[in-house]
Swiss-Prot record:
Regions of compositional bias (Polar residues) in chain numbering: 1-13
Swiss-Prot/TrEMBL GO biological process terms: translation
Transmembrane segments: none
The keyword Transcription regulation belongs to this UniProt entry's keyword annotation: no
Domain of life: Bacteria
Single GO MF annotation: structural constituent of ribosome
Gene3D superfamilies (alphabetical): 2.40.50.100
Annotated stretches, region: Disordered: 1-25
GO annotation, cellular component aspect: cytosolic large ribosomal subunit
Family designation: Belongs to the bacterial ribosomal protein bL27 family.
Protein name, as recorded: Large ribosomal subunit protein bL27
UniProt-listed HAMAP family: Ribosomal_bL27
Keyword terms, alphabetized: Ribonucleoprotein, Ribosomal protein
Length: 88
């Protein structure tokens, strides 16, 4: 074990990799079932209608439709509003 550090060494210079968290699909955007809507740590956004929550609190679409953000009891909710079926 050296009693002195080598020339030009430093105990600094480390940082964790960015986790790419945040909202991935915004209000009004069309999404398919399974698409990730929000990546988060903790429940900053809560799952609403047709939205599921993963083990790491990621919110994802359960059905195809449009993304809608709302507030309910001071909680930010993410919902999926299903598209109306058009008869052809």
């Amino acid at each position: 074990m050296a009693t002195k550090k080598g020339a030009s060494s430093s105990s600094n210079g480390r940082d964790s990799e960015a986790k790419r968290l945040g909202v991935k699909r915004f209000g009004g955007q069309q999404v398919n079932a399974g698409e990730i809507l929000v990546r988060q740590r903790g429940t900053k956004f809560h799952p609403g209608e047709n939205v599921g929550r993963g083990g790491d609190d990621t919110l994802f679409a359960l059905k195809t439709g449009a993304v809608q953000f709302s507030t309910k009891r001071n909680r930010r909710m993410v919902n999926i509003v299903e598209n109306e079926a058009v008869d052809a």
